[in-house]
A protein has these predicted regions:
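Bacterial N-terminal signal peptides that target proteins for export
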Residues: 3-22
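C-terminal motif of bacterial Sec signal peptides marking the signal peptidase cleavage site
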Residues: 29-32
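Small-residue-enriched, tightly packed secondary-structure blocks
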Residues: 34-196
């Protein structure tokens, strides 16, 4: 006669869910986390940042005046976001002051909730005041706050602002979205300094 452990049967769906979540997390980090090697060297980040910046200027010429009037700009050429219930995003970029590269930063975020899929996008953050720039540089794990305006640029549409109409000290543009994942957001994203 076969003895059946009812506790094991009862916990089977929970264990299956935990296993799927665990595998999703591991898969996400294996696919999206970038290792510190030649492909992520400072020179490669700088090159990619310049290409992304020129792309933004082409699709929205109003951003040229914003760039020229900003004391500093953080350019993250590619952010990869993926999720299956648990999700996360990661990207690396360069901080430019007076158009010269001075530091490298990562963006990382985690999320939980209904989500499935993957997406890549670019992000440029314009620091419009010296005070906003200093707050960013002194805090490791900096997050966008109430002093920031975030614009998600859809294909074919201008972001609708110029350096004369910006009212916040931090201005972020998310653009060039590729892939399918609802809810692209910078909420909860942490920016940390990298050594490159």
């Amino acid at each position: 006669m076969k003895i059946v452990n009812h506790k094991m049967i009862k916990n089977l769906p929970v264990n299956k869910i935990r296993t799927n979540i665990f595998l999703s997390i591991i898969t996400f980090f294996l696919l999206s986390c970038q290792t510190i090697d030649q492909k992520n060297s400072g020179s490669v980040i700088n090159r990619d940042a310049e290409l992304v910046l020129q792309n933004l200027f082409e699709i929205d010429p109003d951003t040229i005046s914003i760039y020229k009037n900003a004391p500093a700009t953080l350019i993250i050429p590619k952010i990869t976001k993926a999720g299956l219930v648990l999700g996360g995003a990661y990207g690396e970029g360069v901080l430019r002051i007076n158009e010269a590269p001075v530091d490298y930063y990562s963006l990382a975020s985690a999320s939980y909730g209904p989500q499935i899929g993957a997406q890549q996008y670019s992000n440029i953050i314009f620091f419009m005041t010296e005070e906003a720039l200093q707050k960013f540089r002194v805090k490791d794990g900096w997050e966008l706050g109430a002093d920031a305006e975030v614009v998600f640029r859809d294909k074919g549409y201008s972001i609708g602002v110029s350096s004369k109409t910006i009212s916040k000290p931090v201005y972020a543009v998310v653009f060039d979205q590729k892939g399918l994942l609802a809810g692209t957001s910078l909420v909860g994203a942490k920016f940390s300094r990298l050594i490159r």
